[in-house]
């Protein structure tokens, strides 16, 4: 559907006896979706550009500022080297994501990666002891007490499903809402299994009338633009598609205002007023949208379970990163896997 077209779905609900009770995140897509594919080869020219980016961040003398103001102003008083966690983030796939997002322009890819590394330091996402003010689950937990953002299930390409339910808004607009988006993006991308880099976002604008919900109105443009900049600048090539449903008139007006700020790649991935079931298998979809998962959000159950599972998963992959040398450019295929031997050495040409 086009951006300003509207379509209504009247598919009947799934019979109750077929529903699957669910109140927690799960980390494994169905086995029938297959094993992780091997890494796709790149051209000789692309490989040379990849290696140029790799060499830049392999430099032992590389030091970066702790905040974007210092980066923009060329201030180096508080520069520090890359931590092990930052090297873990700088995977082969990460380099390629930034290269693709920058149309294989090496200088722009390095600039984008540098900006994101500094931004991650500033917002508290390095996951190391050097984080002065880490972005923790406790810091944003109150934002999700009504379940307005949920990671649940996978599409048939094994991409995690990230639900955003604007009609379950429980807090006034603030920077903490941006922080929650960042925290949940980190969660969704961490949940992505071996061989998967992208996520699918499902946005529901339906108004819910429950205790704790204060509004179903769209956020202020300032907050929305901040969130959009986070997605486009710091999570490039992470969005597979974004499906939006139950869009009221005021949300259409909001989307029209935001549309000019979307980059062409993001615009191409937006799908308006199509049922989620057109894109997701029933066994992986919330029953609210004619799926089979009888999902009930209980904050005291879902939130701590999600935090522990994802923290444990991240640490497990970091331990594998250290096992395989702890160097810049290791493949996520190796850190996400179960195998004992390194399949993609940093200097390997694919």
Curated annotation (Swiss-Prot):
BP terms from Gene Ontology: Golgi to plasma membrane protein transport; intermembrane phospholipid transfer; negative regulation of phosphatidylglycerol biosynthetic process; phosphatidylserine metabolic process; phospholipid biosynthetic process; phospholipid transport; positive regulation of phosphatidylcholine biosynthetic process; response to xenobiotic stimulus
Source species: Saccharomyces cerevisiae (strain ATCC 204508 / S288c)
GO MF entries: phosphatidylinositol transfer activity; sterol binding
Subunit structure: Interacts with phosphatidylserine decarboxylase PSD2. Also interacts with PBI1.
A single Gene Ontology CC term: cell periphery
PANTHER family: GH16843P (PTHR45824), PHOSPHATIDYLINOSITOL TRANSFER PROTEIN PDR17 (PTHR45824:SF5)
Record keyword Lyase present: no
Reactions performed catalytically: a 1,2-diacyl-sn-glycero-3-phospho-(1D-myo-inositol)(in) = a 1,2-diacyl-sn-glycero-3-phospho-(1D-myo-inositol)(out)
UniProt cross-references to CDD domains, sorted A to Z: SEC14
Its job: Has phosphatidylinositol transfer activity. Involved in the regulation of the phospholipid composition of plasma- and endomembranes. Altering plasma membrane composition may provide a possible mechanism for multidrug resistance. Contributes to efficient phospholipase D1 activation and phospholipase B1 inhibition in the regulation of phospholipid turnover. Forms a complex with phosphatidylserine decarboxylase PSD2 that seems essential for maintenance of vacuolar phosphatidylethanolamine (PE) levels.
Domain CRAL-TRIO: 139-297
Gene from which the chain derives: PDR17
Name this protein carries in UniProt: Phosphatidylinositol transfer protein PDR17
Keyword Hydrolase included in the entry's annotation: no
Subcellular location: Cytoplasm; Microsome
Family annotation (InterPro entries): CRAL-TRIO_dom, CRAL-TRIO_dom_sf, CRAL/TRIO_N_dom, CRAL/TRIO_N_dom_sf, PI_Transfer_CRAL-TRIO
Extra facts: Present with 5040 molecules/cell in log phase SD medium.
A Pfam family assignment: CRAL_TRIO
SUPFAM superfamilies to which the protein is assigned, alphabetical: CRAL/TRIO domain, CRAL/TRIO N-terminal domain
Keywords (A to Z) from UniProt: Cytoplasm, Endoplasmic reticulum, Lipid transport, Microsome, Transport
Main location: cytoplasm
């Amino acid at each position: 559907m086009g951006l300003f077209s509207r379509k209504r779905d009247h598919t009947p609900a799934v019979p109750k006896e077929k529903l699957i009770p669910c109140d927690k995140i799960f980390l494994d897509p169905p086995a029938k979706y297959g094993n992780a594919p091997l890494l796709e080869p790149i051209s000789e020219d692309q490989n040379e550009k990849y290696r140029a980016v790799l060499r830049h961040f392999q430099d032992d003398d590389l030091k970066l500022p702790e905040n974007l103001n210092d980066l923009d102003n060329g201030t180096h008083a508080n520069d520090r080297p890359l931590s092990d966690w930052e090297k873990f983030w700088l995977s082969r796939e990460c380099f390629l994501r930034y290269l693709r997002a920058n149309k294989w322009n090496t200088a722009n890819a390095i600039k984008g990666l540098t900006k994101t590394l500094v931004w991650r330091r500033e917002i508290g996402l390095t996951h190391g002891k050097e984080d002065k003010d880490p972005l923790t689950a406790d810091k944003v937990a109150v934002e999700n007490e009504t379940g307005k953002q949920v990671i649940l299930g996978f599409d048939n390409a094994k991409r995690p499903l990230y639900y955003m339910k604007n009609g379950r808004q429980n807090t006034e607009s603030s920077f903490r809402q941006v922080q929650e988006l960042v925290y949940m993006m980190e969660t969704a991308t961490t949940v992505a299994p071996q061989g998967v880099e992208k996520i699918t976002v499902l946005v529901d604008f339906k108004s819910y009338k429950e205790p704790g919900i204060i509004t179903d109105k769209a956020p202020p443009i300032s907050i929305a633009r901040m969130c959009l900049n986070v997605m486009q600048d710091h999570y490039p090539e992470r969005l597979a598609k974004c499906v939006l449903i139950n869009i009221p008139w005021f949300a259409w007006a909001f989307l029209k205002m935001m549309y000019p700020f979307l980059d062409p790649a993001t615009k191409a991935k937006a799908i308006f007023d199509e049922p989620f079931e057109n894109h997701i298998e029933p066994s992986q979809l919330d029953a609210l949208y004619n799926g089979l998962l009888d999902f009930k959000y209980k904050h005291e159950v879902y939130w701590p379970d999600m935090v522990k599972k994802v923290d444990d998963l991240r640490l497990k992959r970091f331990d594998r990163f250290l096992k395989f040398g702890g160097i810049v450019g290791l493949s996520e295929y190796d850190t996400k896997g179960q195998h004992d031997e390194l399949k993609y050495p940093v200097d390997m040409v694919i």
